[in-house]
């Protein structure tokens, strides 16, 4: 957990019983993977961290330990950083940078040597952030049913 000096800003692990509060950050009703992610949290494969201001859910990021895609995870070596999202009205305030730095440090503490992240090609702000943090190696440049995206890698 990280606390700010004035103790109203924290980054904390998500408790499964609070998963529904993520609705404050993203629309859980229209996201088809909402229940899949809930199951991954329950199994311990998806470690979700929440950025809070005065207890309000503002940002979310996750570490996925094992995925079916070796570009994203290699057990014991590579972790997948997933669901980096900040509530729209709080964007461009450095919250994404704080979340990403926290997740990278957490992955390092857990013994991972690499972190992978996926990003839509048209998400210029996220691409800039990820490159600034050293996600410069392109593992995949292509598309799926959701559009064109990159899988990027950083050695940590």
For the regions a protein language model found, what residue spans apply to each?
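Acetyl-CoA-dependent GNAT
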Residues: 4-6, 16-88, 100, 106
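Conserved acetyl-CoA-binding loop-helix of GNAT-fold acetyltransferases
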Residues: 86, 92-105, 128-132
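C-terminal "cap" of GNAT-fold acetyltransferases
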Residues: 3, 113, 120-127, 131-133, ...
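Residue-level detector of beta-propeller blades
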Residues: 57, 137-138
């Amino acid at each position: 957990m990280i606390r700010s000096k004035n103790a109203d800003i924290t980054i904390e692990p998500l408790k499964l019983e609070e998963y529904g509060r993520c609705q404050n950050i993203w629309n859980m009703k229209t996201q088809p993977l909402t229940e899949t992610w809930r199951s991954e949290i329950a199994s311990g494969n998806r470690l979700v961290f929440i950025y809070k201001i005065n207890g309000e859910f503002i940002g979310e990021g996750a570490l996925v330990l094992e995925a079916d895609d070796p570009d994203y995870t290699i057990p014991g070596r590579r972790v997948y950083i997933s669901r980096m999202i900040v509530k729209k009205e709080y964007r461009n305030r450095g919250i994404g940078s704080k979340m990403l730095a926290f997740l990278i440090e957490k992955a390092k503490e857990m013994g991972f040597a690499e972190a992978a992240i996926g990003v839509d090609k048209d998400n210029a702000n996220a691409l800039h952030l990820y490159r600034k943090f050293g996600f410069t190696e392109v593992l995949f440049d292509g598309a799926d049913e959701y559009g064109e995206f990159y899988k990027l890698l950083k050695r940590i």
